[in-house]
């Protein structure tokens, strides 16, 4: 039986869900795929859909109710201004490339119909910072899943501009804050094939008091590192 709890908020009654059998949701989680930014086309989410996406993103496990994140939305109305910030940032590091090429490069970065950035903003409280970072990561993944659930493709990226001081200043970040990612959202013009995924058995260990227990997750990582170095 579905376990729910009724809660009152201003003018509406909502039900929280502790568990709900959904083969459709499980199938989606087992097959979801990020879409390259260049393949994201119009239309993007409507304002009501964006609100739903952000509400879903903010509904995460959060030790201490810190809410250690906030969102910045870049829409068509202010995309040109943000592009100029990227151009200026690129000029700082590369004063030899012409303006036309920089504008083209910045335009490609901003090509998705909707862009949302997630700001990690850990509170100076008793909750360990790394636990707050995990909460931010959960919010990021919820944002991706919510946009997917509304029928949109998403690409979650950081890239160089998440760490650029010019961009940080333009995003009005404080010293303790960081950009957890830019989320490029739109209709998937083309869905890519799946990438290599680890077998879950390689990542799973059933605990035992035996000290010789193999750390399967670590073993998989070591194997992957060797494979990557051999390329």
What would you call each of these model-derived segments?
Residues 1-111, 217-231:
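N-terminal amphipathic, basic helical "cap/leader" segment at the start of enzyme domains
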Residues 28, 115-117, 182-184, 205-206:
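Conserved hydrophobic/aromatic beta-strand scaffold that supports enzyme active sites
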Residues 30-33, 113-123:
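Short, basic/glycine-rich phosphate-binding loops at helix/coil junctions
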Residues 57, 116, 122-170:
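Small-aliphatic-rich amphipathic alpha-helix that forms the alpha element of a beta-alpha
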Residues 76, 166-167, 173-174:
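Short Asp/Glu-rich motifs
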Residues 77-81, 88, 122-124, 165, ...:
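Short, charged/polar surface micro-motifs in flexible loops or helix N-caps
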Residues 106-108, 171-196:
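A glycine-rich helix N-cap at a beta->alpha junction
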Residues 194-231:
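Phosphate/diphosphate-binding glycine-rich loops and adjacent basic-rich segments that engage nucleotide
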């Amino acid at each position: 039986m579905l376990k729910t709890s009724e809660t009152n908020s201003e003018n509406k009654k909502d039900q929280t869900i502790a568990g709900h059998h959904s083969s459709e949701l499980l199938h989606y989680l087992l097959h979801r795929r990020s879409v390259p930014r260049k393949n994201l086309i119009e239309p993007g989410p409507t304002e009501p859909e964006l609100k739903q996406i952000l509400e879903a993103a903010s509904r995460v496990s959060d030790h201490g109710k810190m809410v250690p994140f906030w969102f910045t939305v870049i829409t068509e109305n202010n995309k040109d201004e943000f592009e100029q910030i990227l151009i200026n940032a690129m000029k700082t590091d590369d004063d030899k490339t012409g303006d036309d090429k920089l504008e083209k490069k910045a335009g490609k970065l901003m090509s998705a119909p909707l862009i949302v950035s997630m700001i990690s903003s850990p509170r100076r409280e008793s909750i360990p910072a790394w636990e707050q970072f995990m909460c931010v990561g959960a919010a990021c993944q919820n944002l991706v899943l919510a946009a997917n659930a509304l029928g949109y493709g998403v690409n979650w990226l950081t890239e160089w501009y998440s760490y650029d001081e010019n961009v940080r200043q333009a995003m009005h970040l404080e010293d303790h804050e960081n950009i957890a990612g830019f989320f490029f959202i739109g209709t998937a013009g083309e869905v890519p094939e799946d990438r290599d995924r680890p077998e879950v058995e390689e990542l799973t260990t059933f605990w035992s008091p035996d000290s010789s227990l193999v750390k399967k997750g670590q073993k998989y990582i070591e194997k992957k590192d060797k494979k990557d170095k051999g390329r």
